[in-house]
Curated annotation (Swiss-Prot):
Coiled coil: none annotated. GO terms for molecular function: iron-sulfur cluster binding; metal ion binding; protein-macromolecule adaptor activity. Fe cation binds at residues 39, 105, 107. It is found in: Plastid, Chloroplast. SUPFAM superfamilies: HesB-like domain (SSF89360). NCBIfam families: iron-sulfur cluster assembly accessory protein. It comes from Galdieria sulphuraria. Pfam families: Fe-S_biosyn. Keywords: Chloroplast, Iron, Metal-binding, Plastid. PANTHER family: IRON-SULFUR ASSEMBLY PROTEIN ISCA, CHLOROPLASTIC. The keyword Metal-binding applies. This is Uncharacterized protein ycf83.
Length: 112
C-alpha cells in the first residue's frame, strides 16, 4: 500500500517481479492510468514506460524490482484501486478492481 492507496495483490506483484527479471533495463517502469473511452466513459491502461518520460508531475511508487508511475490526473480516479493478475486462459491478465467506480461495463475494462 502507498500514500494514494493503490494496492497490488500478491499475484500481480509476483507477475510484475517476473516480468522485471526479463527486462534488460536497470529497472522496469510501468505506467498506469485512465483515458477517455470504453462503453462506460473511462478505461484503464497499463503500459511500459521509459524513465526519461517520467515528469515531475507524475506520482512514482518504487517497489523492489519495478516502479509504478501514474499521472496526477489519473490518480483521482485510481485512488483505492487494487491491481490484480490472473493467469486464467479465459479473461486472464491484469485487472483493475475499483471500489469507487459507480458503473462498470460487462468486460470490466471500462467504468464511470
Amino acid at each position: 500500500m502507498n500514500t494514494y492507496n493503490i494496492n497490488i495483490t500478491k499475484s500481480a506483484l509476483d507477475h510484475l517481479n517476473s516480468i522485471s527479471k526479463l527486462n534488460s533495463e536497470d529497472k522496469l517502469y510501468i505506467r498506469i492510468g485512465i483515458k477517455q473511452g470504453g462503453c462506460s466513459g473511462l478505461s484503464y491502461f497499463m503500459t511500459y514506460e521509459k524513465k526519461s518520460n517520467i515528469s515531475d508531475n507524475d506520482l512514482v511508487y518504487d517497489y523492489d524490482n519495478f516502479t509504478l508511475v501514474c499521472d496526477n490526473k489519473s490518480i483521482l480516479y485510481l485512488y483505492g484501486i487494487s491491481l490484480d493478475y490472473s493467469s486464467s486462459l479465459i479473461d486472464g491478465g491484469f485487472k483493475f478492481l475499483n471500489p469507487n467506480a459507480k458503473q462498470t461495463c460487462g468486460c470490466g475494462k471500462s467504468f464511470s
